[in-house]
Every structure is written in structure tokens, then in C-alpha cells.
Swiss-Prot record:
Protein name: Casparian strip membrane protein 3
Topology in membrane: Multi-pass membrane protein
Similarity remark: Belongs to the Casparian strip membrane proteins (CASP) family.
UniProt keyword annotation of Transmembrane present: yes
UniProt keyword terms in alphabetical order: Cell membrane, Cell wall biogenesis/degradation, Glycoprotein, Membrane, Transmembrane, Transmembrane helix
Topology, Extracellular side: 48-74, 129-161
Entry GO terms, CC: plasma membrane
Length: 186
């Protein structure tokens, strides 16, 4: 008789209810959003405060490198700032999902905007990484020289700022997947 009961879909009484699993997913979603805020905001601040000045022959002639010398880095800072702002604004919805684990419409909205922010962050990080690669390696065919031999501090900071942004991309992928799993369980 027990086999017949299992065939009809009756499970054991120790199974976790769906609301509990969704609540756990919502708590993980909230924590991942906080970590992503730290990564993207840190990347924007690190890139936005990057500059280095080198003297050339005399103290009166100097070469400088700043993030806003290249529009790609400006786009990187703006995109990371927008994503950080969005994440801060999405925290109340994430808290709502912890309290009301069955909320479907707000999860759909979060999936939509999370995907849009993922695309923006990916575009900014990819464009900036191409410029960072050129700064490190140069391109002999285009007569672009590697500047990282002279501007070491500048290159270290712009390379480091990419880490938080690419970490944010990975976390956004996890956020979208978590929201989709939670939505499928509602």
C-alpha cells in the first residue's frame, strides 16, 4: 500500500514547504544584491578616482593619465554607478520577497530589470577590458603603444576596477537564475 501512496504523489511529511524554500531563495537574493552593490560601487569609485601624473624632463612639463581621458572608462564609471543605484533601489523589493515569498509580479519585474542591468554591466566591463588590454599590450599595427610601462599605478587601478565589475556580472547571472527558480516555484 505504501507504494501506491507514493505513486499518487504523496511525499513524506518531512518535506520543506514551498514558501520556506522561496523564503530561503529570497534571503540569498538579498545577500547577493548587497555583495553586488559593493562590487559595482567599488569598481566605479576605483575607476573614477584613477589618475597619475609623470614628470617629463622638468617639473613644468608633465604627462597625466586620468580615467576621463578615454570615453570608454567614463562609460564604465557611469554604467557601474547606474547598476549600483538600481541595486540599492531594488533592495526593498528583495525584502518584500522575503516577507511575501509568493509575490510573482514583482519577481517578473526584477528579472526584467536585472537582465537589463546585466547587459549594461557586461557592455561596460567588456569595453573597458578591451582598453585595459591595449594599455597593457598596445597594438603595433595601429601604432598604439603600451602605456602601462610608464603609468604603473594607473594601470593597476584600472585593472583592479574590472574585477569588481566582472564579479558583479557573475552575481547578476546568479540573481536572474535565482529569481527564475523562485518564480517557477510560486
Amino acid at each position: 500500500m505504501k507504494a501506491g501512496a507514493l505513486e499518487l504523489g504523496e511525499g513524506s511529511k518531512t518535506s520543506i514547504p514551498r514558501g520556506g524554500v522561496n523564503r530561503g531563495i529570497s534571503i540569498l537574493d538579498f545577500i547577493l544584491r548587497l555583495i553586488t552593490i559593493i562590487g559595482t560601487l567599488g569598481s566605479a569609485i576605483a575607476m573614477g578616482t584613477t589618475n597619475e601624473t609623470l614628470p617629463f624632463f622638468t617639473q613644468f612639463t608633465q604627462f597625466r593619465a586620468e580615467y576621463d581621458d578615454l570615453p570608454t572608462f567614463t562609460f564604465f564609471v557611469i554604467a557601474n554607478s547606474i547598476v549600483s543605484g538600481y541595486l540599492v533601489l531594488s533592495l526593498p523589493m528583495s525584502i518584500l520577497h522575503i516577507v511575501r515569498s509568493g509575490a510573482r509580479a514583482s519577481r517578473i519585474v526584477l528579472i526584467f530589470f536585472d537582465t537589463a542591468m546585466l547587459a549594461l554591466l557586461t557592455a561596460a566591463a567588456s569595453a573597458a577590458s578591451a582598453i585595459v588590454y591595449l594599455a597593457h599590450k598596445g597594438n603595433a599595427q595601429a601604432n598604439w603603444f603600451a602605456i602601462c610601462q610608464q603609468f604603473k599605478s594607473f594601470c593597476e587601478r584600472i585593472s583592479g576596477s574590472l574585477i569588481g565589475s566582472f564579479g558583479g556580472i557573475i552575481l547578476f547571472i546568479l540573481l536572474v537564475l535565482l529569481s527564475a527558480v523562485a518564480l517557477s516555484r510560486c
